[in-house]
Amino acid sequence: MILSPARTRIKICGLTRPGDVDVAVAAGADAIGLVFYPRSPRHVSLALASDLARRLPPFVTPVGLFVNASPEDVERACEQIPNLLLQFHGDETPAQCEASGRPYLRAARMDPGFDLLNFARSYTSAQAILLDAHVEGYGGGGKVFDWSLIPSDVPRPVVLSGGLNPANVTDGVLRVRPWAVDVSSGVESAKGIKDAVLMRQFCEAVRDADARSIDASSGY
């Protein structure tokens, strides 16, 4: 892995309500995910996504999640949310991911037969590779995958996703040392409805992992 940050970035995905956005930001999220996949229970319209993105303070990034969307749909989202970071979660080719000229994340669906190194080398223009569980359909389904499948020399920054929650994210950060972590169902009371307590606990657990990592590297 090319980067092991002193502070692990946090993305909370699948936000649908203004109040949840405010709590996520206050808890310490560095990014919020807006789902543009119509089949997702966390799907938001472009109008709502724009409203949610406008609530964000400086240096908190809106991320738009797309699954095999048309170039026109991606372009409309970029026009409405000028600072949108793209996240492709379907079968998009490198050329399709690069078509808008915007920075993007590329999701990888992890299973024992998946060649992550070859996949990452195919998406050299990606800002990072987001690692999720391989389940039927798209998205990780709130499932944790085997973290031992992650090679130590992934040639892009890694975002760890897939079944993370306040109880396991500390271990995930310490074991994988990703650039960022991404959570959705692990901080929800219902699909698309975030739980304020769980969001705070998740962010605190990530910071605890960072502190432990610093202590370990310092010899304390």
From Swiss-Prot:
Coiled coil: none annotated. It holds the Pfam family PRAI. It is an enzyme of class 5 (isomerase). It comes from the Bacteria. GO terms for molecular function: phosphoribosylanthranilate isomerase activity. GO terms for biological process: L-tryptophan biosynthetic process. Signal peptide: none annotated. It catalyses: N-(5-phospho-beta-D-ribosyl)anthranilate = 1-(2-carboxyphenylamino)-1-deoxy-D-ribulose 5-phosphate. Keywords: Amino-acid biosynthesis, Aromatic amino acid biosynthesis, Isomerase, Tryptophan biosynthesis. InterPro entries: Aldolase_TIM, PRAI_dom, RibuloseP-bd_barrel, TrpF_fam. The keyword Transmembrane helix does not apply. Its EC number is 5.3.1.24. SUPFAM superfamilies: Ribulose-phoshate binding barrel. Pathway: Amino-acid biosynthesis; L-tryptophan biosynthesis; L-tryptophan from chorismate: step 3/5. Belongs to the TrpF family. This is N-(5'-phosphoribosyl)anthranilate isomerase. It comes from Leptothrix cholodnii (strain ATCC 51168 / LMG 8142 / SP-6).
